[in-house]
Regions:
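Glycine-rich hexapeptide-repeat left-handed beta-helix
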Residues: 17-34, 67-88, 92-96, 104-196
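N-terminal segments that cap or nucleate solenoid repeat domains
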Residues: 22-58
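Short proline/glycine- and basic residue-enriched helix-capping loop/turn segments at helix->loop/beta transitions
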Residues: 101
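N-terminal amphipathic/basic-hydrophobic helices that include classical n-h-c signal peptides
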Residues: 1-20
Length: 196
């Protein structure tokens, strides 16, 4: 909002007055615990027993709901726009290890996603799923409850099935994704606006 809003007949500069903030809420006696370097989009929501590691990011309209089960998020995890992270009461907590990427509008519900894995856009990963290190769940896939995806596997379809191994080129791309999202978050950092 660095530029003033121009309306018919007058100009309105909202920068000094409008400071959108993410929603952080306690639930069942637990408040989110975030490393100081975590970046949250202004309309992201983080609720309850959520622990987030250094340089992790939660993007626009994403929801991380630790109200019914603990959510543990490692370092440099990116939870992209519209994604939902949740669990099932008394049954399944969610763990996202370091350098995990959760694609736009994906749902991860009570699963354990290991280091450097990618959950593709619009996919659904259900309770008690284990996604191996460097594995990929393709866009739009539905991984049924209790499934184990081995390290480096590529799963796709509804219901999702193993379609082979992650290619070398995709593995290289994934190795850079977490660092890129840390960089992207830097583009939104406060630049010394009034009141800071």
């Amino acid at each position: 909002m660095d530029e003033p809003v121009r309306l018919v007949g007058f100009t309105l500069n909202l920068q000094p007055y409008f400071r959108p903030m993410a929603t952080l809420l306690p639930a069942r006696g637990h408040a989110p615990v975030l490393d100081a370097s975590v970046w949250l989009a202004p309309n992201a929501t983080v609720v309850g027993e959520v622990h987030m590691g250094a340089e992790s990011t939660v993007w626009f309209s994403a929801v991380v709901r630790g109200d019914v089960a603990r959510i543990q998020i490692g370092r440099r995890v990116n939870i992209q726009d519209g994604a939902v992270i949740h669990g099932t009461f008394v049954q399944s907590q969610t763990v996202l290890e370091d350098d995990v990427s959760i694609g736009h509008n994906a749902i991860v519900h009570g699963a354990h996603v290991k280091h450097s894995a990618l959950i593709g856009m619009g996919s659904v990963v259900m309770d008690h799923v284990i996604v191996g290190e460097g594995a990929v769940v393709a866009a739009g896939a539905v991984v049924l409850a209790g499934t184990t995806i081995e390290d480096g596997e590529l799963w796709a379809g509804v219901p999702a099935k193993c379609r082979g191994q992650v290619s070398d080129s995709l593995r290289e791309h994934l190795s850079q994704t977490a660092a890129r999202y840390v960089e992207y978050a830097g583009w939104f950092q406060d630049d010394g606006a009034p009141g800071e």
